[in-house]
Structures are given as C-alpha cells and as structure tokens.
Amino acid sequence: RLVITTSLFFLMKTYKLKTHYKKILADTLSPVSIYLKIRDKFPNSMLLESSDYHGNDNSFSYICCNPIASLKIEGNLLTKTFPDQTKQNYEINPNKVTQEIDQFTKQFETSEAETFKFINNGLFGYTSYDAVKYFETIEISEKENPVKIPEIQYAVYQNIIAINHFKNEAYIFAHCYKNESNIEALHHIITMDRFAMYDFETTGKISSNLTDEEFKSNIEIVKKHCQRGDVFQLVLSRKFQQGFKGDDFNVYRALRSINPSPYLFYFDYG
C-alpha cells in the first residue's frame, strides 16, 4: 500500500516490538564468519566491525539482518516502510529532515526487560556526505550522482548480533512485531561449521576520475592554500573503478587485511 502526501506528521502509528535475546560464547566466532553464514539466508544484512579488541567500551561488532522497517531520503523524496507492510512516499521540506527522522524513531517501542550498555536496537544505516545540506546552512553544488545511492538510508532490524570481543561473548537479539522469535534458528546458523564461498575476478582495466598529473596539480594547489592559512588540513581523494565478476565481499575482506581500520563496515542493500 502506497501513501502519497506532503504532510509532515500525518501518521504516528506506534509499532511495539517484543525483545528476545540469548547470550552465547563467541571465542570461536568472528564477525566475518558470522556474516558469511547468514547473508544467503537473510538478504540485505549489514556488518559493522570493530578491530579494537583491547578497549571494553569499543570492542563491539554488529551484524544486522531481517530489516522490518526503513527510512530513505533521495533528493527531497522520503520513503518509509513499516513492519505491517505499509509504505509512505512523499516530498519533504529539506529543513525538516531531522524532525522526520526523529518522528520515525518514535514510532517504535521495545519491551526490554533488561537494559544493556551496548547497542541492541535502533536505526542502522548511513548519512552521506552530501546530506550535510539538511543539517547545516551550506550550499553544495549539485553534481550527478554516479553511484546512485540515497543521501540518507536507515533501517530497523529484527535481528542484531552484538559481539563483545573483549569478553569473547555475543548476544543474539530478536525484536519481533507480531511474530515468534527466531533466535534459536539464528543461533544454529551462526554456529554451523560451513558457509558458502563465491569466486571473484576483475574484468577490464582500472579507470580513475583523475590522471596522475591532474592529481599532482591538485596537491600543488592545496599546498598554496595551506601556506596562505586558508586551511590547516585538506584530504585529497581520487576515485578508482574496476569491473568485476563474483562476490564483492571478497573486496571487503582484502581491504581489511591490506589496510586495516579500527572500524569497518559492509552494507548489503541488494
């Protein structure tokens, strides 16, 4: 069902989610292995990985699956989906984006018998760089979006697996709306010994949006800005493109090995 409107607060239905959880030992599990086991059975899953295993507060990784609601902003068009299969699609005032997101989050209530010091529910997703125009009074030159992704995209997930690397334990959560908990089925999947692996190979040649000479020229321009005191730091970027066949999660695995970061993420949006 599709509802088209321009009103901001036309619907405030509240969705009550019943929370179930199970704590398990995770000394033989890793975020990558868990993700590989669940991704074929639960499409549109996401991985948020921490490689900081030494700090208790920051040593959590998250795997989210089973999206039951979502919010997406593309241009000035807002799309929302809900657990009861309803859908809203309408134009928004760019100055009201924060209110729209806040309203969306308030439409969900969880019945948690226990509180946790780490994230176990809420919105998971991203806010792109160009979305700054919704939060700050700043003009951004409109450019073609070659990657064709929404400026803002978040989802509410039924299942969240939180891994505490510091204590070698994991929590499996199920936030259920009018359905039974699937924790035991999920536990069985992530403790299986096997998971599917797929090939990956590159095709064609590597291309870039800048030549070596153009990139070096930009560096010289940046040096002058720094010397004049216009800025104290600038980070230059250069985009490379490479065709491929197969499983792009292998790229994520390679990058986390070649150039590890304290925090990494892999989002599957289909």
Which positions does each model-derived feature cover?
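Extended alpha-helical targeting/anchoring segments
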Residues: 7, 11-270
